[in-house]
Amino acid sequence: MTQPQRPSIYFNVHLVSDSTGETLNAIQRAACAQFENVQPLEHNYYLVRSERQLERVMKEIEAAPGVVWYTISDGALRGRLEAFCRERSIPTLPVLDPSIAMLSRHLGVAPNNRVAGQHALDEDYFERMEAINFTLAHDDGQNVESLIGADVILLGVSRTSKTPTCVYLANRKVRAGNIPLVPGVPLPDFMEKMGDKGPLVVGLKISAERLVQIRRQRLISLNQDEITEYADEEAVRDEITQANRLFQRNGWKTIDVSRRSVEETAAGILNMLHERWGHS
């Protein structure tokens, strides 16, 4: 007899980095892949290098407790984050520390604790950082007046992984921006007039069932028990229908993210860009 499938376990994981977050994301996903039916709810914080930035991060952690994985070189910031989490019994893991400590013992040399020390300061690095800065400045509909300078613009309703997909693309030196599709809120005027010479526009599609599941888990993580229109199945279906009609009307390319990881979605977008740019 087939054993019934165990229900999925959802938990918050906060990834705090003073650099691009690429290392943290790779390690976290590799670790979670070792567990069946485990669904981490990722909260990503990139380029955290000041007290003010850390303050915002800690407020987010307090609002949705879970586990905290971090790569922060600054001793004062590390101390604040660790003390904050310790006072609230929130587990923390400085993911690079074991590897750095082992190398230090083996080589007999103290680490220099450079921020983003894993990145060589070469042309490739600066191109990546330029893309990351562009992406962070054009996240969630910000600075739309300069969004025309993007390589790709992602459109999608709330909770379709627009931001993490853009950050992943930025780590591949792609200038990515995203605009949330909100019922009743029009897109910037230039979006429907760009034609083939503007940025690649990709609509992120998702099934209503999957989106309802994600949004309800999001409400649970924020300790909100009431099912609002945000997670109501009928309202979600209407929202998705409007988005799909918009994509079709403008002839924009689409990717269904219902069961895709961020990496898979980004890979599909990179393929579209390579076709457009004439790369193999």
UniProtKB/Swiss-Prot annotation:
**Broadest EC class assigned to this enzyme:** transferase
Q: Does the keyword Nucleotide-binding apply?
A: yes
Residue sites binding ADP per the record: 156-163
EC numbers listed for it are: 2.7.11.32, 2.7.4.27
Which residue ranges does UniProt annotate as crossing the membrane? none
Annotated coiled-coil segments of the chain: none
Role played: Bifunctional serine/threonine kinase and phosphorylase involved in the regulation of the pyruvate, phosphate dikinase (PPDK) by catalyzing its phosphorylation/dephosphorylation.
Q: Which NCBIfam families match?
A: PRK05339.1 (NF003742)
Which HAMAP family has this protein been placed in? PDRP
Which family does the entry's similarity section mention? Belongs to the pyruvate, phosphate/water dikinase regulatory protein family. PDRP subfamily.
Q: What is this protein called?
A: Putative pyruvate, phosphate dikinase regulatory protein
Q: Species name for this entry?
A: Hyphomonas neptunium (strain ATCC 15444)
